């Protein structure tokens, strides 16, 4: 069948007075032009998004790191995606992923006891359960949904501390994230200090691995994403910057030097999910962070991924 088709092509070329060689040259040239056009379109789109992200930095007097992955098309949107930022409380979603990776679902029913001395600043859930303790699953949920800092420290302890967390990320391909301290010291975010830092690209890649990749089986992925969908601290962040009919599961973070972050898995209707990491910082230690910056950045992403 293939030989007959080649014969027909040869006859057609002969009739038109074109050699097979010239036909190949013509089609090859057309393909090259098409490839150049597509490359140019992508480059133009990247330049446009870079300009918009740069304008947001000027508007809010902040440094911005962005990485988004359309898991259906593998298209990415990025800006300062390889620059380091303090990850702040965004680690809690990924640490919960590590916890699920290293333990059976039954382990989530284990009751963990802790004392008043274990409590650190901003522990709205754990502070109510000093006398009774909490199930490990409840602690993980408190860390992700309420950003409870004592719960975050307990997660760290259950996975081998900050360095255990870092090691677990290395095993899924992250060669960037540095994890060194517990809550609340990890939120210092001193410029130039690489402790407790990562990049938007590394964090987004980790979140993708735990929520849609192979780092967790489907049943555990569902547990993690349900915790993230119930996040009580992200309404003014990525969730505010995407269409209202998109489902968002996120984990926010905040620290000194105007650090404000949000990472999310976002489900547009009838489309594969999008993974988004948005990190930000400012120059002054006591600078106030801007939720609106984290809300406006995803508007650029949504427009670019259409």
From Swiss-Prot:
GO terms for molecular function: beta-lactamase activity. Its EC number is 3.5.2.6. SUPFAM superfamilies: beta-lactamase/transpeptidase-like. Residues 1-43 form the signal peptide. The keyword Cell membrane does not apply. The active site is at residues 89, 185. It comes from the Bacteria. It is an enzyme of class 3 (hydrolase). GO terms for biological process: beta-lactam antibiotic catabolic process; response to antibiotic. InterPro entries: Beta-lactam/transpept-like (IPR012338), Beta-lactam_cat (IPR045155), Beta-lactam_class-A (IPR000871), Beta-lactam_class-A_AS (IPR023650). Pfam families: Beta-lactamase2. It catalyses: a beta-lactam + H2O = a substituted beta-amino acid. Substrate binds at residues 251-253. Keywords: Antibiotic resistance, Hydrolase, Signal. The class A beta-lactamase family has a specific amino-acid numbering system, sometimes called Ambler or ABL numbering and often misspelt as Amber. A multiple sequence alignment was used to derive a consensus sequence and then the consensus was numbered taking into account insertions and deletions. This allows use of identical numbers, e.g. for active site residues, despite differences in protein length. UniProt always uses natural numbering of residues, hence there appear to be differences in numbering between this entry and some papers. Belongs to the class-A beta-lactamase family. This protein is a beta-lactamase with a substrate specificity for penicillins. This is Beta-lactamase 1. It comes from Bacillus mycoides.
């Amino acid at each position: 069948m293939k030989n007959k088709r080649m014969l027909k092509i040869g006859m057609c070329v002969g009739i038109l007075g074109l050699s097979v060689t010239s036909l190949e040259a013509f089609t090859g040239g057309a393909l090259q032009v098409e490839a150049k056009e597509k490359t140019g379109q992508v480059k133009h789109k990247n330049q446009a998004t870079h300009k918009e992200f740069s304008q947001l930095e000027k508007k809010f007097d902040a440094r911005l790191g962005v990485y988004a992955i359309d898991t259906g098309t593998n298209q990415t949107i990025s800006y300062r995606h390889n620059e380091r930022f303090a990850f702040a409380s965004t680690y809690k979603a990924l640490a919960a992923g590590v916890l699920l990776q290293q333990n059976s679902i039954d382990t989530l029913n284990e009751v963990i006891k802790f004392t008043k001395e274990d409590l650190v600043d901003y522990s709205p859930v754990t502070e109510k359960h000093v006398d009774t303790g909490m199930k490990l699953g409840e602690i993980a949920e408190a860390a992700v949904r309420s950003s409870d800092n004592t719960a975050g420290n307990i997660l760290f302890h259950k996975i081998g501390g900050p360095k255990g967390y870092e090691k677990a990320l290395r095993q899924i391909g992250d060669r960037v994230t540095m994890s060194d301290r517990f809550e609340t010291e990890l939120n210092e975010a001193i410029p130039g200090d690489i402790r407790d830092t990562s990049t938007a690209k590394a964090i987004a890649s980790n979140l993708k691995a735990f929520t849609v990749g192979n780092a967790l089986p489907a049943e555990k992925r569902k547990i993690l994403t349900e915790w993230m969908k119930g996040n009580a601290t992200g309404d003014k962040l990525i969730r505010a910057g995407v269409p209202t009919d998109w489902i968002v599961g996120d984990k926010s973070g905040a620290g000194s030097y105007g650090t404000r972050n949000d990472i999310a898995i976002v489900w547009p209707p009838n489309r594969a999910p999008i993974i988004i990491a948005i990190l930000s910082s400012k120059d002054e230690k006591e600078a106030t962070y801007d939720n609106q910056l984290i809300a406006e950045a995803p508007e650029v992403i949504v427009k670019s991924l259409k």
